[in-house]
Structures are given as C-alpha cells and as structure tokens.
Amino acid sequence: MTTYAALLRGINVGGNRKLPMADLRALLDTLGHTGVRTHLQSGQAVFTTGRGDEESLAGELARAIEDRFGFPVDVLVRDHAYLAEVVRACPFPAAELAARQLHVTYFSAPVTPDRYAHLDQVALLPEEFRLGDRCLYLYAPDGLGRSRLAEALGRPRAAKDLVATSRNWNTVVKLAELTAPEA
C-alpha cells in the first residue's frame, strides 16, 4: 500500500469549478482508496491504495471528477518519496523565507532548461526559478500574485504539452508530511 497526494489544478478559484472537499473525499472513497483526507480547499487530497501508478491514478481521478461534477480537471498524483525529495532538494533557503515567497510548480513530465530559454531572467530579478525533478521552484519575494516571473512561466509557450499546478511552500511541506508512512 502506498500513500499518494492528488494535486488538482484550478478548482475552487474565484468561485469557478467548485468542488467541495467532502465530495472529493467521497469520490476517492468510491474509487476504492483508503485513508482519504483533504488539505485546504484548493485541491489537495491524500489517499492510500495498493493498485496503479501515479499516471493511471491521476487519469482515473480526472475521469471520475469529470463524470461526477461535469467539468474537466487536470490531476497530478505523487507519492511520499517524490514529495519528500522536492522538499529536501529545494535550492532556496526555505527556512529563511515566508511561505508566500516560495512556490513549487509540479509538472506531469520532466522539463529541460531550454523550455525557459526565452526568458530574460536578469530583467526579472530579484525573482528567480530553478528546475527540479518534474518541478520548478519559484522564489517571488513579493508573492505569487505580483510575480512577473510567475506570469511568464505560465504562458502557453512555457507550459505547452504539460499539466502544471503550483503550491506555496507550506502546502508543499504539508503534503510531504501527510503522505509519510506512519511510524
């Protein structure tokens, strides 16, 4: 049995694509998963299962959400080992930064630096980003809402052919904790 986090993209934002967390928990239960929990209202669920892999579990959940709620949702599923490594490998001094300054964008596939070669990173300072394993770490000292770099990273050219969803550092750390094996 493996514990996973499901990351849903773009739900419950600005009153659009509403998906109550109680309904998401119930849906995961009906799919046969155990230990189902949600974190916040922005589309994080934790569950345990003994079947499937990250990609098949994400596809199953995305189809079930569309069937049940009538709208498509991009879903990424990641296990504890991956989530813990994202925390461990952070290239920025996470302990020194406010959670609103540090974000991780999770990707459905590996990303290479050439995808972002068109960005003038010097012009976007003091904001910075670094690539990780199927993720991108973003340091935005004034927060994500005011970040010119976040806007540039999210443009279609930069996100082409990928499912991508971002979380602030507090959520990144919490998901690693919630998926950890029980002692």
Which residues does each predicted region cover?
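Surface-exposed, charge/polar-rich loops and edge strands
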Residues: T2-A183
